[in-house]
């Protein structure tokens, strides 16, 4: 007897467990470089450091080769993401947005953060 599922399983997909930050960022960069149509990149934090620039440069390369890139960054976690970097990604054609800007209008908004990572 098969248990019904809300989601159909698609063959050809795979899951890989990444055990370190370095293997994660290598896999991210490879996935970005191999994208064929679009990239949805959502994250809590990107710093203007070697790792952050590595991922940003991969996204910019993708946009420059015609891939549609959507980039959503948490406003609180991304507070070190400079205006210069924002301009750089937008000039490359990346659709960039901040999630939940830090302007607090009620007591609940501070805890509404974008903690998931999607690529």
Where are these regions (language model features)?
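N-terminal localization/anchoring segments of enzymes in phospholipid and broader phosphate metabolism
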Residues: 1-119
